[in-house]
């Protein structure tokens, strides 16, 4: 970010110099060359730091207030062109396997420095302790996002929620899914918006992971698909985009969380 500011100042100074120089003079090549020299890396820096620029804008809008942040990881689990979703524990809907990251005790000092408060919406319990579902002062929003992106002082692995939601519940056999492999497809930032539910501005961040099953694990997933469970929904892309609705049905009772669309729309 500092380098980007330096490039911007250099570009502006070069353009001002050019505006006061005679294009027919040989010295004109100096400011024009400097403008190109500063302009190209500035463009590159803008592309690299686009996300941070967006967060800076959010911070300016909420400087004196707080932003509710939920930082999570969500799985894309696809078998024969259908996606595995599980019943939500708190809401009556189907959603991707996954959940919020947890912070480590080592981050307590940094969290205190940034004025981070725990979420005040959900009743805290042993399961939610350490969840990265927090309230951050707007003036520290960029610093918090940078801390999160560094991956220090917090959970970075995506295995815990997979095990809790699919293995510990008996939906998938423990002997086959003791270890799993996944690919990180990207990080989704939902544009900040005012949440009526939270009564505050809200920024949702989600890492999208794709399960890479072994042949034996794929067979177990197909067996799960062949034996319907009320805790599981195998949804097509169309049904996910319709938030659970199925074309042609008179009684639409299935609800799918919007987060499911993030897992199919993510681009690297």
Residue ranges, per PLM feature:
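N-terminal leader/linker segments that precede catalytic domains of diphosphate-processing enzymes
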Residues: 1-268
């Amino acid at each position: 970010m500092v380098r980007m500011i330096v490039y911007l100042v250099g570009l502006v100074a070069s353009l001002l110099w050019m505006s006061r120089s005679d294009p027919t003079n040989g010295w004109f090549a100096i400011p024009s060359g400097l403008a190109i020299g500063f302009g190209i890396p500035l463009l590159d820096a803008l592309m690299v730091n686009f996300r941070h620029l967006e967060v800076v804008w959010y911070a300016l809008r909420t400087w004196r207030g707080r932003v509710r942040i939920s930082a999570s990881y969500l799985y894309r689990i696809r078998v024969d062109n259908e996606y595995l979703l599980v019943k939500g524990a708190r809401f009556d809907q189907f959603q991707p396997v996954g959940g919020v990251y947890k912070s480590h005790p080592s981050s307590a000092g940094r969290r205190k420095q940034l004025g981070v408060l725990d979420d005040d919406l959900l009743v805290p319990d042993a399961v939610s302790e350490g969840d990265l579902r927090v309230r951050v002062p707007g003036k520290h929003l960029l610093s918090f996002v940078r801390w999160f992106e560094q991956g220090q002082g917090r959970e970075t692995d995506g295995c815990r929620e997979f095990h809790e939601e699919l293995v510990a519940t008996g939906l998938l056999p423990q002997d086959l899914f003791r270890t799993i492999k996944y690919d990180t497809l990207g990080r989704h930032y939902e544009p900040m918006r005012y949440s009526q539910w939270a009564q505050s501005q809200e920024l949702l961040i989600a890492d999208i992971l794709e399960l890479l099953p072994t042949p034996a694990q794929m067979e177990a997933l197909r067996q799960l698909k062949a034996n319907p469970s009320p805790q599981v929904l195998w949804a097509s892309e169309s049904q996910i985009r319709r938030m659970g609705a199925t074309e042609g049905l008179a009684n639409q009772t299935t609800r799918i969380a919007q987060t499911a669309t993030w897992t199919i729309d993510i681009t690297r």
